């Protein structure tokens, strides 16, 4: 059996693609990847040899474009979907699995036009525009945030490094692979207070702010573990007892898998404010704290760091997500829906 995996644009979407690829391989399913020349798709998968083939199309986003721009992008997507149909025929694709993002549009529409099963995984609490549009036509729609909860695909390594936190000795600031300037500034401002409490700092600051952050810690004579990007983020998480992070869905569930208590600062300009609602999913269960970027008071924030019941939160985070989530999605999609596979 050969399937197409499509979608991406951001690390969160692409992390799910990688998990699905690894699960498909376990079941001897071959995968063709269809992504975009734009975004991070090529950086992630151009050299990924486990795909049967990879295609990076000139996909364009529709959101935030003018009326004319949206029409132009839609026509371009329809043209690319025709190219995808040819890919489906050449590689005998039997189903399409989309993780969303504009780069998923051509292959997703092509699946509908070709009468192929279309499976969609929505990573966020608020569905993206493409997924909302295609949901009624999908063979199966998966989401960890809906009433019919589906497992969220998280790499095993985040579970393997999990532990129950009991005492705050190390704190990790996660600005993402691209960095988050606000979180970087917050970390630098909190650094003297953390040093007074003998709390060590681990800081992912992104490439743009790396030198600035490094020099600032040196000027404070603080030995921080500072890095721009790491392919082994789970190793950094393993050493932390508390995280300060944005609330992208993949990051959120990786933190849950690692049972790492977190204070979330949602990115305020995320589409549909989805990062806030992602974090609220945990806050409603008393499993995290949320601070809004525009109203943070440094002293109050620091007090909240010291007050958290790490052991209680860490223990209960074990129940939020489960290992082998991608395996379960592949099983539900392709094997529990065999009547759809032609």
Swiss-Prot record:
It is a peripheral membrane protein. GO terms for cellular component: plasma membrane. Pathway: Cell wall biogenesis; peptidoglycan biosynthesis. It comes from the Bacteria. Its EC number is 2.4.1.227. The keyword Transferase applies. One of its GO terms (biological process) is lipid glycosylation. CDD domains: GT28_MurG (cd03785). It catalyses: di-trans,octa-cis-undecaprenyl diphospho-N-acetyl-alpha-D-muramoyl-L-alanyl-D-glutamyl-meso-2,6-diaminopimeloyl-D-alanyl-D-alanine + UDP-N-acetyl-alpha-D-glucosamine = di-trans,octa-cis-undecaprenyl diphospho-[N-acetyl-alpha-D-glucosaminyl-(1->4)]-N-acetyl-alpha-D-muramoyl-L-alanyl-D-glutamyl-meso-2,6-diaminopimeloyl-D-alanyl-D-alanine + UDP + H(+). Its main location: membrane. PANTHER family: GLYCOSYLTRANSFERASE, UDP-N-ACETYLGLUCOSAMINE--N-ACETYLMURAMYL-(PENTAPEPTIDE) PYROPHOSPHORYL-UNDECAPRENOL N-ACETYLGLUCOSAMINE TRANSFERASE 1. This is UDP-N-acetylglucosamine--N-acetylmuramyl-(pentapeptide) pyrophosphoryl-undecaprenol N-acetylglucosamine transferase. It comes from Campylobacter jejuni subsp. jejuni serotype O:6 (strain 81116 / NCTC 11828).
